[in-house]
Regions:
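Short amphipathic beta-strand/extended segments with alternating polar/hydrophobic composition
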Residues: 58-62, 120-126, 180-181
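Solvent-exposed edge beta-strands and adjacent loop segments
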Residues: 2, 10-86, 135-158
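A general structural signal for short secondary-structure junctions and capping/turn motifs
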Residues: 76-77, 100-102, 111-112, 156-160
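Short, acidic/charged, Gly/Pro-enriched secondary-structure junctions
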Residues: 100-126
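Oligomerization/assembly interface segments of phage tail-like spikes and tubes
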Residues: 72-95, 160-174
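Short, conserved charged micro-motifs
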Residues: 94-101, 177-179
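Mixed-charge, glycine-accented linear interaction segment located at domain edges/termini
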Residues: 129-195
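Short, hydrophobic/proline-enriched secondary-structure or compact coil segments at domain edges
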Residues: 20-27, 85-90, 105-115
Length: 195
């Protein structure tokens, strides 16, 4: 790719809000279709739609505790992006543990929606697809978000918080793609559908 165009920072960019609004996770094997369906990153760096065979699990968290962080490194001419999703779930209880435990064995792909209205795919890469995968070449791309850690507990004092902080990490070979398709949460708020 030639460096033939720069970028412009507008006033709105300087006043953009930060923070994560919601986190959606599904197993890579649930991803049925992706648009555009190409074998390299789209030129405009967006995915316009994604359908799944099962709804996305929707994770809520304590306000201002969720984060998406990206760290790029270049080795032997290849740039890899380590993308981390972390969030804090307050109040340890069985229902929370059951949902979090499911992350220990899956191969998650995430959509991280920001308060700015932008959403980004984590754990999905066009650049590391299995070309023998037929109509779903992303199924075995090995860039999914793995559970890196679950940390938590309770403090000693009565007013201390208790809860768990979950961190998922994906090593992918392009910056997270912007997802511009629809996200529709279910009535109970536990899942969401994409289109």
């Amino acid at each position: 790719m030639a460096i033939d165009s720069g970028l412009i920072i507008q006033c709105a960019d300087l006043n953009a809000v930060g923070g994560v609004k919601q986190i959606l996770l599904t197993d890579i094997s649930s991803v049925a279709t992706v648009t555009p369906a190409i074998t390299s990153a789209p030129a405009d760096h967006t995915v316009t739609s994604m359908t799944t065979s099962a709804d996305w699990a929707r994770f809520e968290f304590k306000a201002e505790t969720a984060a998406l962080s990206i760290n790029a490194t270049k080795e032997n001419g290849t740039t890899a992006y380590e993308c981390s999703i972390s969030f804090h779930v307050p109040n340890m209880e069985a229902a929370h543990s059951v949902a979090i435990e499911k992350l220990t064995t899956g191969c998650p792909v995430g959509i991280v929606e920001m308060h700015s209205g932008k959403a980004f795919l984590v754990g999905f890469s066009y650049l590391y697809e299995n070309v023998g995968g037929g109509s779903t070449p992303w199924i075995r791309n090995q860039t999914t978000a793995n559970l890196a850690s679950i940390e938590g507990g309770s403090g000693a004092a009565y007013q201390d918080e208790n809860g768990l902080t979950v961190t998922l990490v994906a090593k992918q070979y392009e910056l997270p793609l912007e997802y511009t398709g629809a996200i529709t949460p279910s009535a109970d708020g536990l899942t969401a559908a994409t289109a």
